[in-house]
């Protein structure tokens, strides 16, 4: 698969906005898909954020493999990165996020207190790739009491400071992907979970990747969901057999769409597509 290179103008603009507004926030909240704790982190944004304090939120934890979520949280915490694992389809309490923010910024709050300065409100910027669930997370976090804070520095057209409570203000940013995917596996993982448009990658490649990954890591889930599937067969053979078994005749595209939708909707159960072994190839 060739390198996928693309970068819509609005994403380039959003990247600049993130860079310009960093100075107005106390810390950065990075929202990732818990099924892709590593692959759904935008390396371009990570570089821009630099040494700014970070709160890493593993969203959609209800769709991820809980054992893997635990392992990833332990890894990130060992790297000095504070984490939360949440399901933003359920009510996310402001207190949980605010408490995590206060813990993250405890040293700064203490230093300012010694100087006689009381930090009334912490300010953060939420960044993440498309389809990480950022909008749902913010809506749940703010609820119906959401308040737009105007006349503040750092607010570019199309961006708003949102006051969740007296302790926390949030600057929203659009979901931003990076200019090109040089790692084929990362691109396939993003495609399988719906983080990038289906038109960017051939669906047969995405399906074959998904089948092979589930065969290796979650064979019991494949067997449970697709009872006619002979999981010991190679992926292309499985595709041909299942297309016929499901009455699709030779319409392989129909099986690709079905399989990918089943994975995205969690019909195969909880899964995580990143393993700690992936860190070996991470720069």
Predicted regions, residues:
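Structural beta-sheet core signal
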Residues: 30, 56-58, 126
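Conserved active-site beta-strand-loop modules that form the wall/rim of enzyme catalytic pockets
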Residues: 88, 138, 168-171
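Short, glycine/charged-enriched secondary-structure capping and boundary segments
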Residues: 43-46, 70-73, 99-100, 140-141, ...
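Glycine-rich phosphate-binding P-loop
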Residues: 123-143, 173
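Short, structured loop/turn "capping" segments at alpha-beta junctions
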Residues: 108-112, 139, 145-151, 218-221
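Extended basic (Lys/Arg/His-rich) segments that typically form rRNA-contacting surfaces
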Residues: 54-57, 67
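Helix-rich effector regions associated with P-loop NTPase G domains
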Residues: 1-28, 35-36, 41-43, 48-53, ...
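Canonical P-loop GTPase G-domain recognition
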Residues: 62-127, 146
């Amino acid at each position: 698969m060739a390198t996928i290179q693309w970068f819509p103008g609005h994403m380039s603009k959003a990247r600049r906005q993130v860079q310009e507004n960093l100075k107005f926030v106390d810390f950065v909240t990075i929202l990732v898909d818990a099924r892709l704790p590593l692959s759904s982190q935008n390396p371009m944004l990570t570089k821009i954020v630099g040494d700014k304090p970070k709160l890493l939120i593993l969203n959609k934890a209800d769709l991820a493999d809980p054992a893997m979520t635990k392992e990833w949280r332990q890894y990130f915490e060992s790297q000095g990165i504070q984490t939360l694992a949440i399901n933003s389809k359920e009510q996310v309490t402001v207190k949980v996020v605010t408490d995590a923010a206060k813990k993250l910024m405890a040293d700064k709050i203490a230093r300012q207190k010694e100087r006689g300065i009381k930090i009334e409100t912490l300010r953060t910027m939420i960044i993440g790739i498309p389809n990480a669930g950022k909008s749902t997370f913010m809506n749940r976090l703010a609820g119906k009491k959401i308040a737009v804070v105007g006349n503040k520095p750092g607010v570019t057209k199309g961006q708003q400071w949102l006051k969740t409570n007296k302790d926390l203000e949030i600057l929203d940013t659009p979901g931003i992907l990076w200019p090109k995917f040089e790692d084929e596996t990362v691109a396939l993982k993003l495609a399988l979970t719906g983080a990038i448009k289906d038109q960017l990658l051939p669906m047969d490649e995405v399906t074959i990747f998904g089948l092979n990954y589930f065969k290796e890591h979650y064979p019991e889930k494949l067997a449970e969901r697709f009872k006619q599937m002979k999981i010991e067969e190679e992926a292309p053979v499985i595709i041909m057999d299942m297309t016929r078994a499901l009455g699709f005749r030779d319409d392989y595209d129909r099986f690709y769409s079905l399989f990918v939708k089943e994975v995205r909707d969690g019909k195969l159960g909880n899964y995580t597509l990143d393993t700690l072994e992936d860190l070996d190839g991470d720069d």
